[in-house]
Structure formats: structure tokens, C-alpha cells
From Swiss-Prot:
The gene is chbG. HAMAP family: COD. Transmembrane segments: none annotated. InterPro entries: COD_ChbG_bac (IPR022948), Glyco_hydro/deAcase_b/a-brl (IPR011330), YdjC-like (IPR006879). Its cofactor is Mg(2+). One of its GO terms (cellular component) is cytoplasm. Keywords: Carbohydrate metabolism, Chitin degradation, Cytoplasm, Hydrolase, Magnesium, Metal-binding, Polysaccharide degradation. This is Chitooligosaccharide deacetylase. Its EC number is 3.5.1.105. It is found in: Cytoplasm. Its main location: cytoplasm. Mg(2+) binds at H61, H125. One of its GO terms (biological process) is polysaccharide catabolic process.
């Protein structure tokens, strides 16, 4: 039985080093998809590079934890900037959901302006779209726009709550992450998905070359290790040997 594998590189537009790493992992590796932060410092560079990589599907990486929002968000920003305090606000039930809805629509329109087309799908920086308060907003928006959505089904919600027309992969894994990146770890993710009976799987990754922006990230050098693994010829062979076909959310 053939299974669909989507290897999605998050953080397109974060920095030039991140952008170059994603393009390299697409051209010479197994990355088939990426998601772009439209408020990232290198988003124009990312859009330019994507025009030379037609085989790379580009989705939108919804941002509520970093940088400057595209709309006025007085209920979420501090000194005009987004940040990780969103977690505390979510726990306190204090999220400005109307502001978040407007920002989502604005980032979506900005994506179309940058890339000249709709995103293939939506996910989010630091998985904030999986917050119980935010998920219904993003799920409804994706369904209305006719685009797919990354869904971590280990989160607390029922499939019956999803819009009927919403598309997603059957499985999603963020396990290819951390200090122990290897071919074996990637293949374990596939094997675990197969054992669950999933016919489609998205694997999240963050391949990058190191630059000054990436150097400031808490997750720095493993991004370079990810790039090495994702561009290894043996990995592509092992993926095919397990009955997986590389694709994107356009195939869901």
C-alpha cells in the first residue's frame, strides 16, 4: 500500500540561512513542502527563492509569537511586538480572539501578495493554532479558503468537531527534532506512523544553514544536522523502500 509523505520545513522567511537550507533540502533532499512566516525578516528573500523552486509547495506559517503583527493587536502585543506570553494568556482565558481572527486574514492576504498564489496549507509558529481557543478560528478559515491544515491529532479535540470540508494528513509528527537527529530517527517516525495505519503523514523539520539569526535561536545547530540527514541519498531510498511517496498537501 502506497502512503503519502509530506516533509514540511517550517520557518521559511525566518532568515536567509533558513531559506537557503530549505531550498537545498528541497533540491537535493526529501523536503517537499515549506511554510512561510509572512512577518519574517527574510520573507521577501524566501518569496524570491521559491520562484526558482517550482517543486517546493509553500504554505503559510501563522505567526502569533514573534515579530510585529500586520494588524493592530493591542490585546496581544507588548510595545507593538508579539511574544511567547501568549501561553500565559491562553491559560488565563485572556486571548483576544477577534484580533487573532483579523490577523489571520491579514497574514493570508499578505502571503498571496508575496507568492502570487494561495498557500497550499496553514500551520503555525510554535503550534499556536492548536490552542483550543484558536483552533476553531483557523480550522474554519482554512475550510472557507479551501486549503489544508496541519492537525496534531494528539491534541485534545474530536475529529467530529472539524469542518467537514477541511483537508489534512491522517498523521503528523514533530518527533524529528532535538539533539539526536539521525536517519534512524526519521525512519522511526515513518515506522510508527505505519503501525498506526496512517495512509498520509506530515513530518515537520527545520533544515537551515547557520547565520546570525539562527545563531540566536535556542534551536540552532540541530538545524544543520537536519539538513545533512534530509539530503542524504540513503534516506530517500529508505523512504521509497517503506512504500512512501513524497508529496505535499496538494495531494491530500
Amino acid at each position: 500500500m502506497e502512503r503519502l509523505l509530506i516533509v514540511n520545513a517550517d520557518d521559511f522567511g525566518l532568515s536567509k540561512g533558513q531559506n537557503y537550507g530549505i531550498i537545498e533540502a528541497c533540491r537535493n533532499g526529501v523536503v517537499t513542502s515549506t511554510t512561510a512566516l509572512v512577518n519574517g525578516e527574510a520573507i521577501d528573500h524566501a518569496a524570491q527563492l521559491s520562484r526558482g523552486a517550482p517543486g517546493l509547495a509553500v504554505g503559510m506559517h501563522f505567526v502569533l509569537t514573534m515579530g510585529k503583527p500586520l494588524t493592530e493587536m493591542p490585546g496581544l502585543t507588548r510595545e507593538g511586538m508579539l511574544g511567547k506570553w501568549i501561553w500565559q494568556m491562553a491559560e488565563e482565558g485572556a486571548l483576544p480572539l477577534e484580533e487573532i481572527s483579523l490577523e489571520l486574514a491579514s497574514q493570508y492576504q499578505r502571503f498571496i501578495e508575496l507568492f502570487g498564489r494561495k498557500p497550499t496549507h496553514i500551520d503555525s509558529h510554535h503550534h499556536v493554532h492548536m490552542f483550543p481557543q484558536i483552533f476553531p478560528i483557523v480550522a474554519s478559515f482554512a475550510a472557507e479558503q479551501g486549503i489544508a491544515l496541519r492537525i496534531d491529532r494528539q491534541a485534545v479535540f474530536n475529529d467530529s468537531d472539524l469542518p467537514g470540508e477541511l483537508r489534512s494528513s491522517q498523521g503528523f509528527s514533530s518527533a524529528f527534532y532535538g539533539e539526536e537527529i539521525s536517519n534512524a530517527l526519521f525512519l522511526k517516525v515513518l515506522d510508527d506512523s505505519s503501525h498506526r495505519g496512517e495512509r498520509s503523514l506530515e513530518v515537520m523539520c527545520h533544515p537551515a544553514f547557520i547565520d546570525n539569526t539562527i545563531r540566536q535561536s535556542a534551536y540552532c545547530f540541530p538545524r544543520l544536522t537536519e539538513l545533512d540527514v534530509l539530503t542524504s541519498a540513503s534516506l530517500k531510498y529508505a523512504i521509497a523502500e517503506r512504500g512512501y511517496r513524497l508529496g505535499s498537501y496538494l495531494d491530500v
